[in-house]
Amino acid sequence: MSSVPAPREYFLDSIRAWLMLLGIPFHISLIYSTHSWHVNSAAPSWWLTLFNDFIHAFRMQVFFVISGYFSYMLFLRYPLKHWWKVRVERVGIPMLTAIPLLTLPQFILLQYVKEKTENWPTLSAYEKYNTLAWELISHLWFLLVLVILTTVSIGIFTWFQKRQETSKPRPAAISLAKLSLIFFLLGVAYAAIRRIIFIVYPAILSDGMFNFIVMQTLFYVPFFILGALAFIHPDLKVRFTTPSRGCTLGAAVAFIAYLLNQRYGSGDAWMYETESVITMVMGLWMVNVVFSLGHRLLNFQSARVTYFVNASLFIYLVHHPLTLFFGAYITPHISSNLIGFLCGLIFVMGIALILYEIHLRIPLLKFLFSGKPPVKRESRATIG
């Protein structure tokens, strides 16, 4: 445990917040894309589909690298049990709060919008369970994965810490090219696991809890560990914060490959396995692109940025039902996809910010949506 706090990484705080907030244009553009979603516009937009695909191809990989970085930083700062308790509370409490307050009403709304209320009684017990798993976890899946990664990383982080204490500090002798090869092989390994499951027991891939707990965790654990290694080895972080032409070009080529796979791939063939390899390496390269841009443009303290850093989780949690409401009841009345997209951003962000300000004034809601217990202020006693 370290008593000396690490210097504040303003650019990482900012990147994490903006990646979270990027979920808003991501889901609103999904309404106007060619992808089938809960609600869709009458006519899809090719450029909003392209925008949506680009965000989807890298956003969460970079997010989990930052999560791993901060998780290990705090692991060194606090006793093990306290670290685990705090980390799980910070993500677990908001997730459990959002299910009854946000995703359950969202599920009920969609049942009426999609006229499925009459079909619900005809579903089997497992079909009801699986539907609820997908719909109630919904956009909260990354919080569940963070709880799992935090628990799994106890042993990994402890091993990292012991190695730091017993070994002399030395540079991480690994280049971005070697990292690219490693992540390519990790993508192939993940694709192989998925293919084996598809051959042996394909039905399990449609199970919501299996998807969130097993498949999503397996895919994102390398990025989480990479974040911890970037904290342990400052020179590795420097590689990510230093612009790399190779990573930029590689990410561009990977995105083109991603689009081609989306266009010509087949779910019954190798589309999902190919996508996992592409997004694994593209995620790594985009860590360099995003970190280097963020380090240059966002590495400063600002009250406005701090506000959105603090508000980002709450805004992300509430934006999803607001987006679905907009798509179901407002989108059909706007003929232009561009105007609809912009109106959606204003509608969702505006209401989300109002709700954020309201929840700050209600201590119970503030605790439930942040997982942070209220700070006890010591009363000033007059001595004399």
Curated annotation (Swiss-Prot):
Q: Where does the record place it?
A: Cell membrane
Write the Enzyme Commission number(s) for this entry: 2.1.-.-
- GO terms, molecular function: acyltransferase activity, transferring groups other than amino-acyl groups; transferase activity, transferring one-carbon groups
The GO biological-process annotations, alphabetized, read as: glucan biosynthetic process
TM segments?
A: 17-37, 54-74, 91-111, 140-160, 173-193, 212-232, 240-260, 274-294, 311-331, 338-358
GO cellular component annotations, sorted alphabetically? plasma membrane
Alphabetically ordered keywords of this record = Acyltransferase, Cell membrane, Membrane, Transferase, Transmembrane, Transmembrane helix
- Please indicate which superkingdom the organism of origin belongs to: Bacteria
InterPro entries with a match to the protein in the record: Acyl_transf_3_dom (IPR002656), Glucan_succinyl_AcylTrfase (IPR050623), Glucans_biosynth_C (IPR023723)
Class in the EC hierarchy, top level: transferase
Pfam families per UniProt: Acyl_transf_3
Pathway it works in: Glycan metabolism; osmoregulated periplasmic glucan (OPG) biosynthesis
Membrane topology term: Multi-pass membrane protein
Question: Where primarily located?
Answer: membrane
- Please describe what this protein does: Necessary for the succinyl substitution of periplasmic glucans. Could catalyze the transfer of succinyl residues from the cytoplasmic side of the membrane to the nascent glucan backbones on the periplasmic side of the membrane.
Identify the NCBIfam families for this entry. Answer: PRK03854.1
The record's annotation in HAMAP family points to: MdoC_OpgC
Provide the family line.
Belongs to the acyltransferase 3 family. OpgC subfamily.
Q: Tell me the protein's name.
A: Glucans biosynthesis protein C
Q: Which organism is it from?
A: Salmonella newport (strain SL254)
